């Protein structure tokens, strides 16, 4: 059995824990969790214990890594990803990241790539809302590649961001046009998927992103266009 741990114990971590409980990950044991909010970590531990599975809440990242996990699921934040990736990889632990926006930083991306290679570990990028990364990689390998990412959101999904104003409730508008690297800086929790698609193809600086706000729209529409 492979040992699995989680950093960040919110909704996404709960989905992973549920998958373990339901037997959807038969080759993995969830052995530990870590969250800066202790009550959230305790909630997941309690869920696992209710189903007869041993799991502990760790007080620090160091305590979590001392469990010698094979895989660490990062479901916390880009800042957490930047903090944990290198220690985990050096520990012999591969990282499955949901905060893909952290990898838009080219220096950090190169550092984690080199550290993973040096330690026989890997960084796994969760595809999230968009699939087809194998197609993007294949097209990119052919050379002379250009790629665009289109995202449609409802105005309520943009509240709290620099582009939001009340006129978006009644007016359809393109609220952002630029690179994936620029997009993740402006929307650090909204467009992780653009960085994921760019890392599978042309890179964050070269992936062009357009975000449209549509009144009354709920959810997200994603479209990736790639040409070579």
Residue map of PLM features:
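N-terminal Rossmann-like dinucleotide-binding module
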Residues: 1-49
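Active-site-lining helix/loop region of Rossmann-like oxidoreductase modules
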Residues: 7, 15, 124, 129-228
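Short active-site oxyanion
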Residues: 29-32, 70, 121-123
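A short helix->loop->beta-strand "cap" motif at the edges of active sites that frequently abuts
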Residues: 53-55, 91-94, 118-121
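Beta-loop-alpha module in the N-terminal Rossmann-like domain of NAD(P)-dependent dehydrogenases
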Residues: 59-90, 102-105
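General beta-strand structural signal in soluble alpha/beta enzymes
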Residues: 74, 97, 123-127
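Rossmann-fold NAD(P)-binding glycine/threonine-rich loop
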Residues: 86, 100-121
């Amino acid at each position: 059995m492979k040992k699995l741990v989680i950093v960040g114990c919110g909704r996404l971590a709960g989905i992973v824990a549920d998958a373990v409980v339901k037997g959807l990950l038969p080759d993995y044991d969830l052995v530990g969790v870590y969250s800066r909010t202790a009550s959230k970590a305790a909630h997941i531990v309690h869920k696992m214990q209710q189903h007869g599975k041993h799991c502990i809440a760790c007080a620090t990242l160091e305590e979590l890594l001392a469990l010698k996990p094979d895989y660490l699921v990062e479901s916390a934040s880009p800042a957490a990803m930047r903090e944990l990736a290198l220690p985990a990889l050096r520990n012999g632990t591969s990282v499955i990241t949901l905060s893909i926006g952290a990898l838009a930083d080219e220096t950090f991306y190169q550092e984690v790539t080199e550290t993973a290679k040096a330690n026989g570990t890997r960084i796994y990028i969760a595809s999230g809302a968009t699939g087809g990364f194998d197609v993007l990689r294949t097209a990119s390998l052919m050379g002379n590649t250009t790629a665009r990412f289109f995202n449609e959101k409802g105005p309520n999904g943009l509240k709290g961001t620099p582009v939001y104003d009340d006129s978006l409730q009644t007016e359809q508008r393109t609220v952002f046009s630029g690179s994936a690297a620029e997009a993740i800086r402006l929307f650090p929790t909204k467009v992780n998927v653009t960085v994921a698609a760019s890392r599978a193809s042309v890179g964050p600086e070269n992936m062009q992103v357009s975000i449209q706000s549509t009144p009354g729209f709920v959810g997200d529409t994603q479209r990736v266009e790639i040409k070579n």
